[in-house]
Structures are given as structure tokens and as C-alpha cells.
């Protein structure tokens, strides 16, 4: 289904198009991140991690295909952070990438 995160992504892409047109400039998405930890600082459930991958894949696809070529890249902020360190990282407590990072494949 359509989530509040989907609405945020839709709005983000609209803003990229509007700003790049208004200011005639290229843009980048920086400091994006997906939920990888639960409220206790433990690795989130498989379904939460898969949803993060889906959202990140959508951001990457939309930025590449739906910004009239004006979005020049997407940075994931601190993906190497472990769940106990940062809720929006993308690695396990053992230091391995979660499925979220597969969105970049």
C-alpha cells in the first residue's frame, strides 16, 4: 500500500523538479536514511528492513528517472552505523550491510 513515506518521497521529487526549474540548477539528495533499528536500539524486523530497501530503491529510481536529469545523486547519511548507534543507519550490530543497501545494486 501507499505509506506516509511514499507521500514524502513523492513530495521530495516534486520539490526537486520545482527547485531545479526555479533556480535553473542541478540538485542532490543528501542525508537520506531508512529505519534500521527498533525502539530498543536493536536491528529492526525483516519487514521494516525490506520496506527501507523499497523506499530507498524508489528514491534512487525517481531521482534518476523523474527529475528531468536534474538530480545528480543520492547520499545515504552514515549507512555504516549500527542500530545501537543510529536509528537510520543500514548495517547490523556486527558491522554487515542490511538488505537496505541492496537498493544501490
Residue ranges of model-derived segments:
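Aromatic- and acid-rich polysaccharide-binding/catalytic face
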Residues: 1-17, 21-36
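Aromatic-rich peripheral "rim/lid" segments of glycoside hydrolase catalytic domains that contact
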Residues: 11-14, 18-21, 37-58, 62-105
Amino acid at each position: 500500500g501507499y505509506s506516509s513515506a511514499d507521500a514524502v518521497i513523492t513530495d521530495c521529487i516534486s520539490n526537486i523538479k520545482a527547485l531545479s526549474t526555479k533556480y535553473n540548477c542541478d540538485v542532490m539528495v543528501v542525508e537520506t536514511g531508512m529505519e534500521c533499528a527498533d525502539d530498543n536500539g536493536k536491528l529492526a524486523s525483516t519487514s521494516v528492513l525490506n520496506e527501507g530497501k523499497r523506499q530507498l530503491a524508489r528514491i534512487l529510481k525517481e531521482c534518476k528517472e523523474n527529475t528531468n536529469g536534474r538530480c545528480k545523486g543520492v547520499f545515504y547519511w552514515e549507512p555504516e552505523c549500527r542500530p545501537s548507534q543510529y536509528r537510520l543507519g543500514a548495517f547490523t550490530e556486527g558491522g554487515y550491510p542490511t538488505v537496505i543497501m541492496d537498493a544501490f545494486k
